[in-house]
Amino acid sequence: MTTLNNLPSILVTLVGLVFPAFAMASLFLHVQKNKIL
């Protein structure tokens, strides 16, 4: 039951950390690809 109660906060933390990191990484790769071309 504790895991179920903590799930929203865990999801928020995960999304708050992983999504910006993924967005920045994809943006960085996109810029690098455009620089080469």
UniProtKB/Swiss-Prot annotation:
Keywords for the protein's UniProt record, in alphabetical order: Chloroplast, Membrane, Photosynthesis, Photosystem I, Plastid, Thylakoid, Transmembrane, Transmembrane helix
Cell compartments where the protein resides: Plastid, Chloroplast thylakoid membrane
InterPro entries: PSI_PsaI (IPR001302), PSI_PsaI_sf (IPR036357)
Topology relative to the membrane: Single-pass membrane protein
GO CC annotations on file: chloroplast thylakoid membrane; photosystem I
Protein family according to the UniProt entry: Belongs to the PsaI family.
Protein name (Swiss-Prot/TrEMBL): Photosystem I reaction center subunit VIII
Annotated source species: Pelargonium hortorum
